[in-house]
Amino acid sequence: MIIRSPEPEVKILVDRDPVKTSFEEWARPGHFSRTIAKGPDTTTWIWNLHADAHDFDSHTSDLEEISRKVFSAHFGQLSIIFLWLSGMYFHGARFSNYEAWLSDPTHIGPSAQVVWPIVGQEILNGDVRGGFRGIQITSGFFQIWRASGITSELQLYCTAIGALVFAALMLFAGWFHYHKAAPKLAWFQDVESMLNHHLAGLLGLGSLSWAGHQVHVSLPINQFLNAGVDPKEIPLPHEYILNRDLLAQLYPSFAEGATPFFTLNWSKYADFLTFRGGLDPVTGGLWLTDIAHHHLAIAILFLIAGHMYRTNWGIGHGLKDILEAHKGPFTGQGHKGLYEILTTSWHAQLSLNLAMLGSLTIVVAHHMYSMPPYPYLATDYGTQLSLFTHHMWIGGFLIVGAAAHAAIFMVRDYDPTTRYNDLLDRVLRHRDAIISHLNWACIFLGFHSFGLYIHNDTMSALGRPQDMFSDTAIQLQPVFAQWIQNTHALAPGATAPGATASTSLTWGGGDLVAVGGKVALLPIPLGTADFLVHHIHAFTIHVTVLILLKGVLFARSSRLIPDKANLGFRFPCDGPERGGTCQVSAWDHVFLGLFWMYNAISVVIFHFSWKMQSDVWGSVSDQGVVTHITGGNFAQSSITINGWLRDFLWAQASQVIQSYGSSLSAYGLFFLGAHFVWAFSLMFLFSGRGYWQELIESIVWAHNKLKVAPATQPRALSIIQGRAVGVTHYLLGGIATTWAFFLARIITVG
């Protein structure tokens, strides 16, 4: 008789048909809330509808139901992303000069939008050369397509159709996993399985498949393109996969197949998996063979990482154990209890993810110019400026979002009775020390960084240049930054003797790389001017953090309002009889933090734009003489406030201000319109609610006189609604103004 151990029971992790699909339900506005579903009495109803539609916490307190809604919404989000991507690829296929650009990327500008002549606006179709007229694009899609080996508009069509299919699939998945097979709460909370799948699947296999695509498709096609072969003559992607000899002609090790891999003679593959460093002198981008090597290495790391956590087989790490083992001499219970927080509060989890992703996005912004990954990206100055600006703004918004959700967690999900002496509790108990020290740091940075500029403006005004802080008078060299630059420039000699250059040309030491008579990249010098503006960066970042962190740490209570947690995440004031308690809610801290985030990012993108035009971007003569766009004026002009106003804002705005009557006139209109949108925001930010309510009532009286009064009573915006509308227009107007200013400038001079 054979005695078997009992088979482990398979856990059923989904519920079948939990919520019936109902079109009637969808068609009823506010079906998620009893109050809103009754329909409008006053115009406040439409605001509440928008505020609460996606606030799943307010629909139900059942964590499983909330998790399912969030999960389903993610599929909807992915569907929109695929739809957007499909549109981008379709424009590339139908309305662009991609094939012409591919044949001569140094002289022909990328365009994927042609304006139809309806009321004379075909003036916007500028000459991008190569016999094509259209709007010059600065999204970097052409460069990505070339890097991935797309050689024809037909391939773009096929990809666009593929993305549409995926968009439909995602929509279906969103419906299916909410209405047909909805995961149980235990599935959402199984962090080890989630880690294994995301690490090994998404990041590991994702990187591996991309590395495979790069080796088998991108590398050979780009090799041909770099050699000047006509795109129409280049073999199609599937031919390299079916015919190994094609690849072996370009990369001899392919002839040996997998033998070197299994005999551990891996160096054989060094002809297509390289470690060179620096930039490809033909395209001004990173070596694609370096990039393929990088993705292969990343894939191996993540495939290993994806097998580290304990699931059904009782081996590996458990996340709870890891967290609870973290105890230092000064941290009490350490991370005890964090596991429970992060598996029961999606706001806490989201907050961490947003903080990480926001920081990562800003890192991406800096790498896109210092290590330009795609061919001909570095010499497309408009795209370089757009990519930097875009990733900086996105990073800023994500980091503010991190603070917002941390505060929502504190108000809605934090349970002080079960949290004693763990790290979070200890941070909350000495929050006064944290905030007051941070406040001191902000004051110090603000006065000193601004004071250096004011000193320079004063000395400049008095005609005493010898007494200014500058590279030619009193020097304040950024010695630590210069030391880091130097170390990185010299590092490959010691750490990677096989590499021909350092990770980035910006560190120094190397020569400049020029493509088609334009600078792709060169060593970036840092001096007194950078030292000054870096301290402005430090100041604005610290103030943003001060506002956001104060909002989180005082979200539940403060000396002023001890019962703040009962008032919720957003409230205007603590009742009419308590003066001086307005703008204290966690929501208001996010509101105020957004303005400082805007300040911080604005200074960064202004610094970048001017620094690159002054010290990096420009043309190279046949004799090798570099002429920068603004002739190196950053070091002497940006050391005074007046210099920033006169030589950056005013001098470089001439293109957008004078754009009327040219193909850039849309930027002139946007510049004007976005200024208006920004100014319009002030009407909401400085408004008094009572003033508008009085005005509304006299307008309603007039409507009643004429018997045209609506059934829904008009109401003035609440204090919070006014602030929300105000900050939205402030940011939208400011960002669109900057966008028009940057693009009109760089498309003209770049």
Curated annotation (Swiss-Prot):
Keyword Iron (UniProt): yes
Annotated positions binding phylloquinone: 692
Ligand binding (chlorophyll a): 683, 691
Broad class of where this protein is predominantly found: plastid
Gene Ontology CC annotation, any one: photosystem I
Reactions listed under catalytic activity: reduced [plastocyanin] + hnu + oxidized [2Fe-2S]-[ferredoxin] = oxidized [plastocyanin] + reduced [2Fe-2S]-[ferredoxin]
HAMAP family for this protein: PSI_PsaA (MF_00458)
Family designation: Belongs to the PsaA/PsaB family.
Name of this chain's protein: Photosystem I P700 chlorophyll a apoprotein A1
Species this chain originates from: Atropa belladonna
Gene that specifies this protein: psaA
